[in-house]
From Swiss-Prot:
PROSITE patterns the record matches: RIBOSOMAL_L27
Gene: rpmA
Family statement: Belongs to the bacterial ribosomal protein bL27 family.
SUPFAM superfamilies assigned to the protein according to its UniProt record, in alphabetical order: Ribosomal L27 protein-like
GO BP annotation list: translation
Lineage of the organism: Bacteria, Bacillati, Mycoplasmatota, Mycoplasmoidales, Metamycoplasmataceae
InterPro entries per the UniProt record, alphabetical: Ribosomal_bL27, Ribosomal_bL27_CS
Record's keyword terms, sorted: Ribonucleoprotein, Ribosomal protein
Protein name: Large ribosomal subunit protein bL27
Length: 84
């Protein structure tokens, strides 16, 4: 005999919240030093000039300037062109 009735579906119904990944500053927009440009899992986009990479693979600006995304040999790069 079953101790409880068949109620398996009520024990499912959970999901984790979205991780808010993706682009935070668009191409051509101004970024301040330390501001996050792109949040990612793994290196979907690689750091270019004046861009650092964090422990969680987030890309951030090392200088104040304009964000540029470019594709070089099948790899996407994020760079920051310094403001004058």
């Amino acid at each position: 005999m079953a101790k409880t009735k068949a109620g398996g579906s009520t024990k499912n119904g959970r999901d984790s919240a979205g991780r808010r990944l993706g682009q935070k500053i668009g191409d051509g927009q101004f970024a301040l030093t330390g501001s996050i440009i792109y949040r990612q899992r793994g290196t979907r986009i690689y750091p270019g000039k004046n861009v650092g990479i964090g422990n969680d693979d987030s890309l951030f600006a090392l200088v104040d300037g304009i964000v540029k995304f470019q594709k070089i040999r099948k790899r996407k790069y994020a760079t920051v062109v310094m403001a004058k």
